[in-house]
Amino acid sequence: MNLVQAVYLNNAVAPFDNQQVRQALCYAIDRQSIMDMIADGHGTALGSSIYPAFTKYFLPELVQKYPYDPAKAKELLAQAGYPNGFDMTISVPSNYQPHMDTAEVVAEQLRAVGVNVTIQPMDGACGMSRSIRAGTSRPRWWAWMPVP
């Protein structure tokens, strides 16, 4: 299945309004490890949530922009004023187990750099829509795929 999974942050609220925090989160995630653990090694690491088939919008130079580097992630968090990390909750659609499994791996990787992640299962698209309409600033997990 061609599927892009991503965590979407509200860049207007702390701590996600800080570019160094967002960069730290990128460096903290080992995308290849996720594919190895969740998809039996299948998949392609992307540098954005734009599917490569959308060639007009996909930027291949982003693929290697943030290589897995937990030391760099910790350094950026400290520079951003979070030397001990911070707490965050990620809302994840619970209607598809691979989303939940992937979110658990991401949470573990973020915890390794000091970001204490709690996963909040949501009842699929309806729960996510309610959360978005309510203006909740919580990070959200989302996945999408191209439709022929």
What role is predicted for each listed range?
Residues S49-I50, D69, M88-S91, M122:
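Beta-strand segments within the central parallel beta-sheet cores of soluble alpha/beta enzyme folds
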Residues L3-G47, K74-L76, D87-H99:
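Alpha-helical secondary-structure segments
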Residues A45-Q79, Y96-D101:
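Structural transition elements
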Residues A24, A28, M37, L76-A80, ...:
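Generic, well-ordered alpha-helical scaffold segments in large soluble proteins
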